């Protein structure tokens, strides 16, 4: 089973009733002992779009309200509105009688979309600032044995050498809170579920400036899927900014190799004990 097929199998849902699905999180898509946020986003995306007349979640918003445990859970789906061109609904991820994630999404169908296109966002210059061969596989084993998250190990990810904080000397004065990387799930071209997963694929990019900061939970995530990619390999560019009282925003753009912007995301995350960890 290739990487693409493995991911699709990890999204398996069991229909419990007309509006409820059950699933067991796949440990290959975990951060430590917790399901990865982008993986949960993909699961909720699949549950909702399976019930809507439009198959493509063009805008998704999820609030991570509490920890999702590595055990069976349910997805409770509510359809809010359907129309000719789009539809909307929400999903509650419920585990042990507690809502751990709240998801809402607007869906449409790329096959039938029409309208003007312009104001394109080009691939970033940093992509070509060094040879592709100089990008480094994201692997923290040289930094700390066993520290590479399992969700990172399920795809090919090569990071710009300036952003490989685990494999260079840290310089908070000169390093950016940024990560640029080539991405690919071998075996298929990314669909909307894979793009949901990849929208949260980058570990917190503040680490490129400050080094390892421990657990940095994502509190809210917005993902916009702009179009389906035409190439298997993708390029992602993530940038963090405006740390305030430990909270910061992280913005990501994802392109295919033809230069098409296929997805964007923005998340709000929190550095726990940030004053202590960054200033020490």
Language-model features, listed with the residues they occupy:
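Terminal targeting signals and extreme-terminal segments of soluble enzymes
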Residues: 1-280
